[in-house]
From Swiss-Prot:
SUPFAM superfamilies: GroES-like, NAD(P)-binding Rossmann-fold domains
Organism annotation: Drosophila melanogaster
Pfam families (UniProt xref): ADH_N (PF08240), ADH_zinc_N (PF00107)
Name of the protein described by the UniProt record: Alcohol dehydrogenase class-3
Record's function text: Class-III ADH is remarkably ineffective in oxidizing ethanol, but it readily catalyzes the oxidation of long-chain primary alcohols and the oxidation of S-(hydroxymethyl) glutathione.
Cofactor needs: Zn(2+)
Entry's Gene Ontology cellular component terms: cytosol
């Protein structure tokens, strides 16, 4: 039994009091876990574009005040009543997509989108309807069921997975979102085949991870499409073979027509990792007539819609979406950790900056400027 079990813990957290404002480092109170909940001492968390998306005010589910963060790893501090899969001291990764193995979605075998706690998670509270986080007497909302921008957090016991204690938490925390998302989009969603041609729009962490997945599948050519050419040399480490800067070919008509001419008909697989509805269309229309598949990974702003001419689909192109790379979170993340430990999966190479919690706003600035792939906040 830990000295803090059953007690309220006061700790540091980065609080988003309102949209479009910098995070504020505050002392918050983290209540003990209730039934089927786990309290975790977070040791490291990544800073992801999804956190910035919600902070920007563009997220239709964005709630404030909130503790953001969803790419975290740590050590179990205590567990609530009925928790059997975890105990104090376990090394864990928080999961924004849970896995209950009981709901219609989990039982279908067709998706990783467990819906057991979807409604309460979207409402920023724990499954029983309240928050475990507060500051200055005010309730704070949870974020994506994880809230890892805090030294301690509470999650549902289906939103957590136990991992090998040999894995460095300050590295494998990234398997809680970005790397897994891109890597799995290539392997699980698109099911890229050996010798195929692929293109990735957006060479951030997710896009680079798509490249890794395409390389793992044996793709023959992997194109990176980005308006920041500074990313191209680094992307070669992740399997990319060719690069196109849309700004350089703007005088040649649409980017999709340029790419179709360049590749003798288009790509077998394309991936949109930006969240821009215009590039989503470009990615689809740059796939090969008859069999091309385009995977949407990036999240667009509230109210935005995608469009294309129906004939693009009639002639055999396929538009697909991918969340968390199609991985079944509780079952598959520990396997990805093992792949990392066996040096079969790059993780360290995504980390460009390590910062303390006090500098978390700097991590957002680096991301917005395109000067980082992933910044890690270490507690």
């Amino acid at each position: 039994m830990s000295a803090t079990e059953g007690k309220v813990i006061t700790c540091k957290a980065a609080v988003a009091w309102e949209a479009k404002k910098p995070l504020v480092i505050e002392d918050i109170e983290v209540a003990p876990p209730k039934a089927h909940e786990v309290r975790i001492k977070i040791t490291a968390t990544g800073v992801c574009h999804t956190d910035a998306f919600t902070l920007s005010g563009a997220d239709p589910e964005g709630l404030f005040p909130v503790v953001l963060g969803h790419e975290g790893a740590g050590i179990v501090e205590s567990v609530g009543e009925g928790v059997t899969n975890f105990k104090a001291g376990d090394h864990v990764i928080a999961l924004y997509i849970p896995q209950c193995n009981e709901c219609k979605f989990c039982k279908s075998g067709k998706t990783n989108l467990c819906q057991k706690i979807r409604l309460t998670q979207g409402a920023g509270v724990m499954p029983e309807g309240t928050s475990r986080l507060s500051c200055k007497g005010q309730q704070l909302f949870h974020f994506m069921g994880t809230s890892t921008f805090a030294e301690y957090t509470v999650v549902a016991d289906i939103s957590l997975t136990k991992i090998n204690e040999k894995a460095p938490l300050e590295k494998v925390c990234l398997l809680g979102c970005g790397i897994s998302t891109g890597y799995g989009a290539a392997l699980n969603t698109a099911k890229v085949e050996a010798g195929s041609t692929c293109a990735v729009w957006g060479l951030g962490a997710v896009g680079l991870a798509v490249g890794l997945g395409c390389k793992k599948a044996g793709a023959g050519k992997i194109y990176g499409i980005d308006i920041n050419p500074d990313k191209f040399e680094l992307a070669k480490k992740f399997g990319f073979t060719d690069f196109v800067n849309p700004k350089d070919v703007a005088d040649k008509g649409s980017i999709q027509n340029y790419l179709i001419d360049l590749t003798d008909g288009g790509f077998d697989y394309t991936f949109e990792c930006i969240g821009n509805v215009n590039t989503m269309r470009s990615a689809l229309e740059a796939t090969h007539k008859g069999w091309g598949t385009s995977v949407v990974i990036g999240v667009a702003g509230a109210g935005q819609e995608i469009s294309t001419r129906p004939f693009q689909l009639v002639v055999g192109r396929v538009w697909k979406g991918s969340a968390f790379g199609g991985w079944r979170s509780v079952s598959d993340v520990p396997k990805l950790v093992e792949d990392y430990l066996k040096k079969d999966l790059l993780v360290d190479e995504f980390i460009t900056h390590e910062l303390p919690l006090s500098q978390i706003n700097e991590a957002f600035d680096l991301m917005h400027k395109g000067e980082s792939i992933r910044s890690i906040i270490k507690y």
